[in-house]
Regions:
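N-terminal, active-site-proximal structural segment of metallo-dependent hydrolase catalytic domains
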Residues: 1-106, 196-200
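Acidic/histidine-rich helix-loop elements
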Residues: 8-29, 51, 134-139, 143, ...
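Active-site flanking residues adjacent to catalytic metal/cofactor-binding acidic residues
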Residues: 9, 46-47, 167, 217-219
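Metal-dependent phosphoesterases centered on the DNase I-like endonuclease/exonuclease/phosphatase
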Residues: 65, 172-224
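Conserved beta strand-loop-helix elements of the APE1-like EEP
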Residues: 68-70, 100-121, 156-157
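Active-site catalytic loop in hydrolytic enzyme cores
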Residues: 115-161
Length: 224
């Protein structure tokens, strides 16, 4: 049986990856890479990871920075929120980006591995993870309540060929802290339950009913 060291890490806001001075950004990146190096995981699931196009038209991506620094052989980025698709509401971020010479900012989840990914339906062949929506609001309003949510679904190309999940479930305004609202707490629990039910439905026929192994990582925004 293969032994794996797994790690999950929320970077605390894709926006923050590209705000502040260049010295601040370098310090954040160094701290993240140092933490990952200390753990040295075989599998790493990251939430709220960001990338953008710089002034010269080059892709500036935390996914690439982590992959290269930690020497991961395989990486996949799944976008959940983007400047071009959603920022017509949160236009302060768009304007800040335009006049600081970066564009096409997006954030999402990422999966890193030292083992190849396989196809979901054929573990003998290498494949590409899938980025699957589990919550898509009719209108994005620039708030966490309407943040789109996706799950990355993949599989490892090594016995026993476990399926991999990287998810980031919803958290609602008003559900935390001393001033938390009871209605918000209950609505948040219901929303996360619905998202988990969608994931279970996604896996039920081809994974769960066959009792195949699953490794589920992510930020569940919930108490154990």
């Amino acid at each position: 049986m293969i032994k794996l060291r797994v790690m999950t890490l929320n970077l605390g806001g894709g926006v923050k990856n590209y705000s502040g001075s260049s010295e601040d950004l370098a310090g954040k990146t160094e701290a993240i890479n140092r933490l990952i190096a200390q753990v040295h995981p075989d599998l790493l699931a990251v939430q709220e990871i960001a990338q953008h196009i710089d002034a010269d038209g080059n892709l500036d991506s935390m996914v690439d920075l982590i992959r290269l620094a930690a020497h991961f052989d395989h990486a996949f980025y799944g976008e959940t929120l983007s400047m071009k698709r959603h920022m017509q509401v949160k236009k302060d971020l768009m304007i800040n980006g335009l006049f600081n010479d970066w564009w096409d900012w997006s954030k999402g989840n990422a999966l890193f591995s030292r083992i190849p990914f396989s196809r979901l339906g054929d573990e003998s062949k290498e494949g590409v993870p899938r980025n699957i929506p589990i919550f898509q609001p009719l209108v994005y309003e620039g708030t966490r309540d309407t943040d789109p949510r996706n799950v990355i679904l993949s599989r490892l190309k090594v016995a026993p060929f476990p399926y991999l999940l990287n998810l980031h479930l919803t958290t609602l305004t008003g559900e935390r802290g001393k001033g938390a609202w009871a209605d918000s707490i209950e609505q948040a629990k219901l929303t996360r339950t619905q998202q988990m039910e969608r994931i279970i439905g996604l896996l039920e026929t081809h994974v769960l009913m066959k009792e195949l192994p699953i490794i589920m990582l992510g930020d569940f925004n919930a108490n154990p």
